[in-house]
């Protein structure tokens, strides 16, 4: 089997395609969470602690000199990134928890009895007819 055909067999497997779709959706979800944290969560928190915008929090290690930009330790962006991570992790946890609950409900739900075959149906009818004949006086 050539290298190209092996790669093709690997790439078209369901798990690889599912993983690729998951990565793409995850990247888009990350952008949504970043916007949620930066635009919805952080402004009220900043307002509560005195109107501070977390993304602007930084410590200047060395001031700008001429064309050389300042050396800044931007810990506000780090705090915002941590909140992004916590919210994404919590959302994933809740999703996995919901999926596990659905799997447990499926496992607990009784399955319908199998449909009897034509032979079983015929034998049941014969049995019922024989019982009916025995019960006649």
Curated annotation (Swiss-Prot):
Keywords: Cell inner membrane, Cell membrane, Ion channel, Ion transport, Membrane, Transmembrane, Transmembrane helix, Transport. One of its GO terms (molecular function) is mechanosensitive monoatomic ion channel activity. The keyword rRNA processing does not apply. It is a multi-pass membrane protein. The keyword Transmembrane helix applies. InterPro entries: Mechanosensitive_channel_CS (IPR019823), MS_channel (IPR001185), MSC/AndL (IPR037673), MscL_channel (IPR036019). It is found in: Cell inner membrane. The chain crosses the membrane at residues 9-29, 79-99. GO terms for cellular component: plasma membrane. Gene3D superfamilies: Large-conductance mechanosensitive channel, MscL, domain 1. It holds the Pfam family MscL. Its main location: membrane. Homopentamer. NCBIfam families: mscL (TIGR00220), PRK00567.1-4 (NF001843). Belongs to the MscL family. Channel that opens in response to stretch forces in the membrane lipid bilayer. May participate in the regulation of osmotic pressure changes within the cell. This is Large-conductance mechanosensitive channel. It comes from Pseudomonas paraeruginosa (strain DSM 24068 / PA7).
């Amino acid at each position: 089997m050539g290298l190209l055909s092996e790669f093709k067999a690997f790439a078209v497997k369901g798990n690889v395609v599912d993983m690729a779709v998951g990565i793409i959706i995850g990247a888009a979800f990350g952008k949504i969470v970043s916007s949620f944290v930066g635009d919805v969560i952080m402004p009220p928190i900043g307002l509560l602690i005195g109107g501070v915008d977390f993304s602007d929090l930084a410590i200047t290690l060395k001031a700008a000199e001429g064309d050389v930009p300042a050396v800044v330790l931007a810990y506000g962006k780090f705090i915002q990134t941590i909140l992004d991570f916590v919210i994404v992790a919590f959302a994933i946890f809740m999703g996995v928890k919901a999926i596990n609950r659905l799997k447990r409900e499926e496992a607990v739900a009784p399955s319908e009895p199998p449909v009897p075959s034509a032979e079983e149906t015929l034998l049941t009818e014969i049995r019922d007819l024989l019982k009916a004949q025995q019960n006649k006086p």
